[in-house]
Structure formats: C-alpha cells, structure tokens
Amino acid sequence: MEDGFSSYSSLYDTSSLLQFCNDDSASAASSMEVTDRIASLEQRVQMQEDDIQLLKSALADVVRRLNITEEQQAVLNRKGPTKARPLMQTLPLRTTVNNGTVLPKKPTGSLPSPSGVRKETAVPATKSNIKRTSSSERVSPGGRRESNGDSRGNRNRTGSTSSSSSGKKNSESKPKEPVFSAEEGYVKMFLRGRPVTMYMPKDQVDSYSLEAKVELPTKRLKLEWVYGYRGRDCRNNLYLLPTGETVYFIASVVVLYNVEEQLQRHYAGHNDDVKCLAVHPDRITIATGQVAGTSKDGKQLPPHVRIWDSVTLNTLHVIGIGFFDRAVTCIAFSKSNGGTNLCAVDDSNDHVLSVWDWQKEEKLADVKCSNEAVFAADFHPTDTNIIVTCGKSHLYFWTLEGSSLNKKQGLFEKQEKPKFVLCVTFSENGDTITGDSSGNILVWGKGTNRISYAVQGAHEGGIFALCMLRDGTLVSGGGKDRKLISWSGNYQKLRKTEIPEQFGPIRTVAEGKGDVILIGTTRNFVLQGTLSGDFTPITQGHTDELWGLAIHASKSQFLTCGHDKHATLWDAVGHRPVWDKIIEDPAQSSGFHPSGSVVAVGTLTGRWFVFDTETKDLVTVHTDGNEQLSVMRYSPDGNFLAIGSHDNCIYIYGVSDNGRKYTRVGKCSGHSSFITHLDWSVNSQFLVSNSGDYEILYWVPSACKQVVSVETTRDIEWATYTCTLGFHVFGVWPEGSDGTDINAVCRAHEKKLLSTGDDFGKVHLFSYPCSQFRAPSHIYGGHSSHVTNVDFLCEDSHLISTGGKDTSIMQWRVI
C-alpha cells in the first residue's frame, strides 16, 4: 500500500502547497494589488483541490486493486488447486464486458443478465430525452450474442451522418432459404440470389438435417490487449491518470495502459470510432465522444458523449443523442466549479459548440461555432463561464450567460493572422496561450481578446501541441520540425529535443510521472521520455488500412502488414514489436512458412517479398501480375507456396531450402473473379479456393489442374479453414447477406472453434463445424471499421483480429 501512495506523491508534490499556505506575505495588502491577491487565492484553492483529488485517486486505485484481488481469488476458489501461472496471465482475468461495465465472473457458458449492472436502467425514463445506456452482451434474435449500446433519442438538429464502419442495409426482399439435397449430398445457399453449392462428407449425408440446432461455443473471448493509437487525425487524446495508467483511444476502444505493470484495461462502451477524450478535474471521471455509425441492418447509430468511471469502467451518463451531428470532435470539462459543466463541438457544417450539465444530462446552451474546422475547445481554468475555441482561421472567446454563448474574436492586430490556430492552453495567472500554423506562440491576457506577448518563430512550421506543466513550465510540440521545447514562465526557451523522424510529427503532449513527458505522434506512436533524454515508444501501430495477418507456427508471434508499407512482427506475450520492416509497396497479405523461419508478404502491386523472421532481412522478391495479392499460403509440408491474386489466378511456387528458394510451378486459372481465400489439404496434395463471385474450386497445385470430381473433393481433410464458403462454415453467414459481409474465417487448431470478422466491426466466435444455417455465435465489438482478418495463435490460447481503416490490432484471450 505504501508503494501505491508513493507513486502518487511523485505525481503531485504537496510541499509547495504547505510552503505557500504558511507564507503570510501572500495576504499582505501592502505588497499586492487586489487582482494579484485574487489570483493568489485562486492558485491556492486550485492547489488544495489538486491535493484532494490526489487522495481521491489514491483511494480509487486501492479499490480497483482490491476488486482485482477478489476476482482472482474467486476464480481460484472455483477452479481449485492449479499450477502456478505468471502474473501476466492471471491479472487480466478482470471481467469487463464490451459495454465498459464490470460484471462478476460467471461460470463458462453462462450469460450475463441483459439488464446489466446499473440499477438506474430499471427505473422508468425521466423527463430527460436522453436515455442512460447500459448495454450488455446478449443473444440476438438469431441466436447471436451481441454487445451493442441502446441508442434512443430524437434529433433536434438534422444533418447528414457518416461512419468509418461499413454499415450495410440488407435487402428488403426475403432471401432464399438454403436447400439440402440428400440424394446428391449437398447444401445450396444463396448469396445475392446466386446459388452456392457445398458438398458434405459422405459420412454426414444420412444424419444431416437443416433443422438441427447448433450450440453456442462454451469458450468465450475477452479483450486482453489493443495495439495502436489514433494520433494521425485526433488531438488532445493522451493523459496520465493518478493511478499510473495512460489513457488514449483507437477504434471504438478507450485504452487504460499501465506501462509499469504491463497491463491494459479497456472501456468498450462505444459502438463506433472514438474521436475525443477529456479527463475530469477529479482525475477519475472521463468523457469520450464518438462518430455517427450505421448498424448492419441500416439503423443509424447517433454520435454522442459517454461519461464513465475510470476505476470501475461503469458508464455514468450518455449525453447528446439526437443532438450532435456526424461526430463529436472536441470535449472538455470545466475546472473552477468542480467540473460540473462539459463543452463539446460536433462535426456538423456549423461545428456547433454546446455546453452541458453532464450530471443532469441537460444542455445549457449551444451556438454555431464556425464554418471551418475546430481543433480545440477548453474552459478557462478560473472562470467557468469562459470557453476558448480555435481552429482554421479563428480564435474565439465565448462567454456563457444564461442559455446563450456570446463570442469575442481574438484580435491579432499587428500580428499576422495565421491560417490555423492549432492548440490552446492556459498559464498559471489565467492567460490564454495558443500555438499556430506559423510557428508562433501567442499569449492573450486574462479576460481580454488581445495579444499581450508573442514568441515569434518558436517552431519551424506549425505548433501542434501545448502543455502547461505543474511547475509552470510550458512545453510546445512542433509538427514539421518534430521538436519538443520547454519555456519558462516569461517565455524564455529552456530546453529542446527533436523526436526521431521514424516517429513522425508531434500531435499531442501530456505530462507524465515526475519529469516524464508523454507524446502522441501522427504516425500513431505513444512515446515517453524527458526533455534531457531520449524518447522511447510505449505504444505503436499501423497508420493505414490493415489487412495482412499471419501466425507463427510454433511461437506466440504474429505478423501484420498494411497499406502503410510496414510489416511488423509482434510478440503476443510481451505485447510489443519484435521488428518492423518498411517495404516498397503497400502490403495486403502474409503467410508464415511452417518452419517459422521465413514469412511471405504480398502487396497491392503484384510483388511479393520473403523475409527472414529472425533478422528481418530480405530473402527474395518476385512479381506475379500487377494486381493485388490477397492470399499468401504455404502448404503444410512447406514445399509449396500458393498466391491468390486479383487477376483471378493462383500462382504456385515450389519451395526448398527451408523457405529460401522459390521456383515457379505455374498458375491455376479457372476462376471468373478475384481470389479471396485459399486452404491446403493436410497432405499438401490439394488446394481449395474462393473467389469474389462466390465460386468454390479445387485444385491439384503440383500440376495446376482443377479437380471437378465431387467424389474426390468432398472428403478431403483441410489443414486450415480460412475459406468463407464451404459446407463446414456456411452457418457463419447472416440471413440476407450480400456475400461481402464476412471478410475472414479461421478455424482453431483444436477444430472446436471458428472465428469470423465482418464488415460491421464485429468478431464472432462459433462452434466448429458450423454447418447449420444461422448458427449462433458470441459477438464482440471493439473495431470500428471492417474486421479484415482473424486468426488463432499457435496454441489456440488467443485470437488476433485486425481492423481495416481503424488500423487497430486486437488480442483476445480465449476463456
């Protein structure tokens, strides 16, 4: 316990508070003007509030740790004596369902109550038109367990909505039901009205029935780790909590990452991209805003703000449903009144600024902010009624008076007006400080809209971030020059350091523990370090659309590759990259050789590379066609490599020297559309392929010949099952699917589980085989874009999923 409190004392040094309180000169009228005395009192109150919040945060962390210990003890008591396990495997057993609430651990196979854990959800709706949301994992009408927020409310302002996730509305016409032919031994399903015929093994023909029921898998998934950070297009989204956790977001998940303990917790109450984040003055309550989305049935998912507890991960309030348009891009809590109010800016054409009493879920005022983009909005630290917004071609000082917001424009006067005011913060005496696209730091006197001081050319290029440290030091972060500079109270330069080019421009800066600075970059790195030392990454991820995923055959490692031209080998135990390789073309697919010694990466241009997995050195490079290579799949014996291309062909290579020599055998031609998926037979003699027009074809790859005999192909045992079309997996397709809803399928090595990734940001877990129409599944959210790939680690202990445009990688523990 003492260690826990000592960590907080390093965050907030209270000795200065005691010294200040004992200084009688602070109240001597003869030595101070009235305004100075008021400022001093404001500082004193703020310091006392900080100290109180320190104690609150410490107590909250104690409660959190006790909850973890109790849950672990309960699990151990149920399971009885077990072998000792490493701390990394035992601590993540905290049960957090996808609505961001903590539920008691239940025996495997039991379902959480749909009513959730929040008592207030059982109370009839009050006069507020904004419903408090408590979603929990549930079984959908089709038997599928879902984790979705209940979003209700009428829009007060209309406008277009958009989403990064691929919402698709199913056809209104009733889809055709599957047909079973006992004579021929096949099931025929229909996608977009087109028949897809799938032959079953002979020994299943007599016993098969379309009406048979499939049970939900007894296993479940729990989100253990999220790789990545959204810095490329979001700001002010990185904070250190007093508990020692760094909080940030990617996709629809807010990550709370304890770097020292190497543990992550996740708030997953959102149903689409999170775009903004704010921490309450109590340092425990957090607000996050999201974009509008569309569900798989075409239902609109409105943008909103969720306020939640960072200790319990319980959702406290949901505001703005039916009011915000497109997305919520900026949010901030008030400071001087204990954080009672919250301001938000949406992404409508008018970029409406609104102020809320978030505890009552009531809107106090709203106003059109600007026709141009708004980058930041924040309350003045000592005046609750003052809000500052900045963005393209503007800096506005807003005064809240009753239910109206009155605007004063920042006057640049002799100072050349910048194209963009990029960031804003406040000094100890209440001055407003801005950083702009011209590289200038401008100081605006407290209570005025005029410049009182200017630091010309503070950076070469735009200043993307400003952070006022607890000791009154100002830190600025440059975009173009990637420099981090500290400034004294009178704006004299103290220190500067340059962030290495590989990490990209600085997007946001936050104060860490002690003299540590946290940096988020536009290349989606989170760095930590000091102004006098080096900065090292604590989180990193891809920066462009992500499709390629390959699992090592014998190690807890996996490789991802994307359109950002990066191929990264990850350690799933240490949750960090083993190496990262920049390639010449955008990458689309990858596959490990069975020996694990090499990995192949396919690109959008028809080129493919083979890398040594130990050294990341290039082994060989080849080109087949000039179109996207969607699949790279080695045969189980390691003697062949099959490459599925968007030119409708499958290229076959003979492989020798443990994956280091390649000889082209030929190409399999016969598909009338692009290749989507490939699987090898256990004996490496046959290949099955799917295409974009729902064809299922079989091949003898050594001769590049198609196999048309049903009697030959129906009983083949497949080493993997990644094809989305086939008798053993057709139950994964939802009713009315258009044939593109499911991007990836993967069978576990033990052949009892099947996972899929769909176009609606969901990861599904089915029982295998999945050969009954509309089979039930457990459904998990987290991704905000289409889930492009899923695969089980070599021992089936974890599942890895990749998001497309959300660029995230999620590691799920199989429990």
Swiss-Prot record:
GO cellular component, one term: perinuclear region of cytoplasm
UniProt KW keywords: Coiled coil, Cytoplasm, Cytoskeleton, Disease variant, Epilepsy, Intellectual disability, Lissencephaly, Microtubule, Phosphoprotein, Repeat, WD repeat
Stretches for region Tandem atypical propeller in EMLs: 176-815
Subcellular location: Cytoplasm; Cytoplasm, Perinuclear region; Cytoplasm, Cytoskeleton
Signal peptide span: none
CDD domains the UniProt entry points to: TD_EMAP1
Repeat positions for WD: 261-310, 315-358, 363-400, 409-446, 450-489, 493-530, 535-572, 578-613, 617-655, 664-701, 709-768, 775-814
InterPro entries the record matches: Beta-prop_EML-like_2nd, Beta-prop_EML_1st, HELP, Quinoprotein_ADH-like_sf, WD40/YVTN_repeat-like_dom_sf, WD40_repeat_dom_sf, WD40_rpt, WD_repeat_EMAP
A biological-process GO annotation: brain development
Tissue localization of expression: Ubiquitous; expressed in most tissues with the exception of thymus and peripheral blood lymphocytes.
Region annotation (Disordered) ranges: 77-179
Low complexity compositional bias, start-end: 156-168
Compositionally biased tracts (Basic and acidic residues): 143-153
PANTHER family from the UniProt entry: ECHINODERM MICROTUBULE-ASSOCIATED PROTEIN-LIKE 1 (PTHR13720:SF22), WD-40 REPEAT PROTEIN (PTHR13720)
Domain characteristics, as noted in the entry: Contains a tandem atypical propeller in EMLs (TAPE) domain. The N-terminal beta-propeller is formed by canonical WD repeats; in contrast, the second beta-propeller contains one blade that is formed by discontinuous parts of the polypeptide chain. The N-terminal coiled coil is required for association with microtubules.
Protein name according to UniProt: Echinoderm microtubule-associated protein-like 1
The species this protein was found in: Homo sapiens
Gene name of the record: EML1
